[in-house]
Amino acid sequence: VGSEMCIRDSSSMGRLFDAAAAILGICGQATYEGEPAIELEAAAWRALGGKTVRLGGNHTGVFTSADDSPILDPQPLIEALLNGIEAGAPADRLALEFHIAIARSSARIAREICVHEGIDTVALSGGVFMNRLLLQLLTRELKYAGLAVLVPHTVPVNDGCIAYGQAAVARTRLAQVAPQ
């Protein structure tokens, strides 16, 4: 934190998973794209030990609204990990709690957006949803809130899906301005 390193803001959930994996000592240096997040998910699954996740307690992260756009504030999540380490909690259990907090926080943000926009459907897309545990937890939270959940099945959920969606939007926009 106090070094001369260049640290940039990011809107990528993946960077938050990378940070959590490093803080917990699960994966300090990636040797391939997505490795820290993959190792963090594996640790969370180990904590489950084949059991079903029970979402009791208050694992909701904090979010703040900037320019009427809700954003997840990572500071309380990082502090919770550090406090857990200090208390001697196993890294695997903290990885699971991190997943639960991200799912709960994301569901809360999605619910707020749905209410504001008057919609009841949420599409889950992006590389973070390669994480099957996060996908299951968030889907459960959204459905419990009465929201329909869309997840791509014929295109990949990661950047391939995002690129496909961008191409579809571009095609629609071009069709609107092109002469008939």
Model-derived regions: residue spans:
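A mobile "lid/hinge" subdomain adjacent to the ATP/sugar-phosphate binding pocket shared
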Residues: 61-90
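Short, small-residue-biased leader/transition segments that mark boundaries at the very start
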Residues: 1-7
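Conserved phosphate/anionic-ligand binding catalytic regions in large, soluble enzymes, centered on
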Residues: 8-27, 31, 160, 165-166
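A short glycine/serine-rich beta->alpha loop
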Residues: 8, 93-97, 150-157
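Conserved phosphate-binding/catalytic loops in two-lobed NTP-binding clefts
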Residues: 120-122, 132, 138-162
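Glycine-rich beta-strand-to-loop/alpha-helix junction loops that act as flexible
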Residues: 13, 122-129
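Glycine-rich phosphate-binding/hydrolytic loop that grips phosphoryl groups
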Residues: 150-180
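Adenine-nucleotide phosphate-binding core of ATP-dependent small-molecule kinases
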Residues: 82-113
